[in-house]
Amino acid sequence: MNQLRLEPIKKVSGTINIPGSKSISNRALLLATLAEGTTTLTNLLDSDDIRYMLASLKQLGVSYRLSNNNTVCELDGLAGPLNASEAQTLFLGNAGTAMRPLCAALTLGQGDFTLTGEPRMEERPIGDLVDALRQLGAEVSYLKNDGFPPLSISSTGLNGGNVEIAGDLSSQFLTALLMVAPLAKDDVNIQIKGELVSKPYIDITLALMAQFGVKVQNNDYASFVIKAGQRYVSPGKVLVEGDASSASYFLAAGAIQGGEVKVTGVGKLSIQGDVKFADVLQQMGAEIEWGDDYIISRGAKLTAVDLDMNHIPDAAMTIATTALFATGTTHIRNIYNWRIKETDRLAAMATELRKVGAIVDEGHDYISVTPPAELNTAAIDTYSDHRMAMCFSMMAFADCGITINEPECTSKTFPDYFNQFNSLAH
C-alpha cells in the first residue's frame, strides 16, 4: 500500500489554477457528441472519470482530437444520438458522471449496450434513473442486482411523454434525463418526486444545455418541460470552469493557515454551486475576496457553524476537516447523499475524524465535529475516494502532521493534488 506522509505546515500562501470541473467536463463532452458541428473544449479535466467517458465515446464511433496534456479536446458532433450496429460493452470504472448520462443517452439511438464498472459502481444506485427512462419507453434491464449497475440497454429511441423521477437521492439522475430529453420523439414533462437535492448541479446542466442551444422550462425545480424537435448545436468553443469542489481544499488551507491563498478558474461568475463553500468559510471567520474568475482566502481565527449543506455536498466534506481547526462544534446537516458517493462518505468521515481525536456524532443525514484539545497523528484510510484523501490533507496544519493511505486515489479528479498542495507551504 502506498502512503504519503504530510509533515506539519506552519504557513501557506500562493496561487493555484484549479483543473477543470469533472461535472462540467463530462456533461460538455456528451452534449458536444449529440450536437451538430465541431466543439473545442478547453481546460478539460484530465482524470479517470473523463478518460472513461472519452474511451466510451471513441468506442461508439465519436471522433475527437486531444492536446498533448489532455486538456483541450476538439470533438466532432454526431448531430443526433449515439448508435451501434454491433453490441457494445462499455466499462466506466467508478465514474458516476459517465455512467448516469451515458445510460440515458444510449436509449436515444439504435443498438444494444452493456454498461459495467468497478465493484463500487455496482453498489451505487441508478434505479431512479432507470425507472424514469422506462416510463419514456426505454428498454433497460439489470444484469445483477435490481436498482444497480451493470445494465443492459436495447435501444430503439426514446418516446417522450410524462415522467416522474425521485429528486431526493442524487441530482445526477435528473441531469441525465434533462440532457437526453430534447432528442426524444415527443415533448418531455418531468415531475420531481420529493425534495430535489443538490439544485446547483441542475443549474450547471441547464446552463450547458442553453450554451448548446436548447431551452428548458424550469418550474421552480418542481417540474421541467422540454419541447421536442430541439437540437443541440455546437457553440464552437466551451471553456470548462475550474472544479469548485477542488478549489475548496486550497480555500480552506488559506482560512486555517494563511497567509493568502488565491484560486483561479472559479469566481463570482461561476455556474457551480460549490463556490458557495467560500461563504461558509467566511461565516467561520475567514476573510474572503471574490473576483469574476478568482477567489482569495485569508487566515483568521475560525469558529464552528451549524448549517444545511445540501446545496454543496462535495465541498461540505472539506468543512468536516476544517472543523478540526475551529472553536466549538460544527454541525453539517442534510447530507444523506454523502452515503451513495464513491464510498459511504458519512461513515468514512466519522471513522477517520475519530482517529485524529475528534468527537464525532454521525447521524442518518448529518455529522457533528468537535475538535479535541490536541489533534493526534494517524494513518488515514481513503476508501478509494479522492475527496477523503484531499480533505484530510488539512491535518498537515496540525502540529503532528498526518499520513494518507493510498493517496493516488486523487487521480479521479486531481492527479497533481498533493504537489499543488505542497507548493503553498512556507
Curated annotation (Swiss-Prot):
InterPro entries: Enolpyruvate_Tfrase_dom (IPR001986), Enolpyruvate_Tfrase_sf (IPR036968), EPSP_synthase (IPR006264), EPSP_synthase_CS (IPR023193), RNA3'P_cycl/enolpyr_Trfase_a/b (IPR013792)
Catalysed transformations (reactions): 3-phosphoshikimate + phosphoenolpyruvate = 5-O-(1-carboxyvinyl)-3-phosphoshikimate + phosphate
The protein's Enzyme Commission number: 2.5.1.19
GO cellular component: cytoplasm
Cytoplasm as UniProt keyword: yes
Primary location: cytoplasm
Subcellular location: Cytoplasm
Positions annotated as active site in the UniProt record: 314 (proton acceptor)
Binding site for 3-phosphoshikimate: 22-23, 27, 170-172, 198, 314, 337, 341
Pathway field: Metabolic intermediate biosynthesis; chorismate biosynthesis; chorismate from D-erythrose 4-phosphate and phosphoenolpyruvate: step 6/7
SUPFAM superfamilies in the record: EPT/RTPC-like
GO biological process: amino acid biosynthetic process; aromatic amino acid family biosynthetic process; chorismate biosynthetic process
Superkingdom assignment: Bacteria
This protein's UniProt keywords: Amino-acid biosynthesis, Aromatic amino acid biosynthesis, Cytoplasm, Transferase
Alphabetized Pfam families for the sequence: EPSP_synthase
One annotated GO molecular function: 3-phosphoshikimate 1-carboxyvinyltransferase activity
Residues binding phosphoenolpyruvate: 22, 96, 124, 172, 345, 387, 412
Record-linked PANTHER family: AROM/DEHYDROQUINATE SYNTHASE (PTHR21090), PENTAFUNCTIONAL AROM POLYPEPTIDE (PTHR21090:SF5)
NCBIfam families in alphabetical order: aroA
Summary of subunit composition and partner proteins: Monomer.
Protein purpose: Catalyzes the transfer of the enolpyruvyl moiety of phosphoenolpyruvate (PEP) to the 5-hydroxyl of shikimate-3-phosphate (S3P) to produce enolpyruvyl shikimate-3-phosphate and inorganic phosphate.
Name the record gives this protein: 3-phosphoshikimate 1-carboxyvinyltransferase
Organism: Shewanella pealeana (strain ATCC 700345 / ANG-SQ1)
